[in-house]
């Protein structure tokens, strides 16, 4: 028999300021990968993490 699909899924977090701000330290968009529990966190995740392109801590939002 096949195993049940897990509750944890892999998501990608992308910097909000990199997409909207063209005048930044270096070109590119900061992305992090992490896991989230589908049962506990049903809405999209937003975490403040360090962005090497902006050179500061910025909010990172979950993308598909």
Curated annotation (Swiss-Prot):
State the organism named in the record: Prochlorococcus marinus (strain MIT 9313)
Which cysteine pairs are covalently linked by disulfides here?
A: none
GO molecular function, a single term: structural constituent of ribosome
Q: Which GO terms describe its biological process?
A: translation
Q: Does the keyword Membrane apply?
A: no
Q: What is the lineage of its organism?
A: Bacteria, Bacillati, Cyanobacteriota, Cyanophyceae, Synechococcales
Listed name of the protein: Large ribosomal subunit protein bL33
Similarity field: Belongs to the bacterial ribosomal protein bL33 family.
Question: What PROSITE patterns does the entry give?
Answer: RIBOSOMAL_L33
Identify the InterPro entries for this entry: Ribosomal_bL33 (IPR001705), Ribosomal_bL33_CS (IPR018264), Ribosomal_bL33_sf (IPR038584), Ribosomal_zn-bd (IPR011332)
